[in-house]
């Protein structure tokens, strides 16, 4: 039988069984190691209302809270919502993560401080 991927589309290796999780989009049961995971950090307040709220606020130093969500997708939902895309046979072997998306107006982050 031909084999499409070295890891069979999973990160299981020596474990016999992995607990299933539910897809965020369609609620399909997917093994936790096979699910495509996406960690999203967003402002609770939408971009259009940030200025209004900061002007109306009493405290100048108040930082608006963020919303931290870990999304789990089944393979079909991840492809459909363009979280991942199918790649050529040679490109599948490339394990480097895709480049991080940075908005055009964002300032570059300072390098981490040495310890």
UniProtKB/Swiss-Prot annotation:
Region (Disordered): 85-115
Name assigned to this protein: Small ribosomal subunit protein eS26
Organism: Ovis aries
PANTHER family (alphabetical): 40S RIBOSOMAL PROTEIN S26, SMALL RIBOSOMAL SUBUNIT PROTEIN ES26-RELATED
Similarity-based family: Belongs to the eukaryotic ribosomal protein eS26 family.
InterPro entries: Ribosomal_eS26, Ribosomal_eS26_CS, Ribosomal_eS26_sf
Top-level taxon of the source organism: Eukaryota
Task performed by this protein: Component of the small ribosomal subunit. The ribosome is a large ribonucleoprotein complex responsible for the synthesis of proteins in the cell.
PROSITE patterns: RIBOSOMAL_S26E
Location of this chain's protein in the cell: Cytoplasm, Cytosol; Cytoplasm; Rough endoplasmic reticulum
GO CC annotation terms, alphabetical: cytoplasmic side of rough endoplasmic reticulum membrane; cytosolic small ribosomal subunit; ribosome
Any GO BP annotation: cytoplasmic translation
Stored Gene3D superfamilies: Ribosomal protein S26e (3.30.1740.20)
Gene coding for it: RPS26
Ranges of compositional bias, category Basic and acidic residues: 87-97
Modification type Phosphoserine: residues: 54
Keywords tagged on the record: Cytoplasm, Endoplasmic reticulum, Phosphoprotein, Ribonucleoprotein, Ribosomal protein
Residue ranges of coiled coil: none
Oligomer status and interactors: Component of the 40S small ribosomal subunit.
GO molecular function, one term: mRNA binding
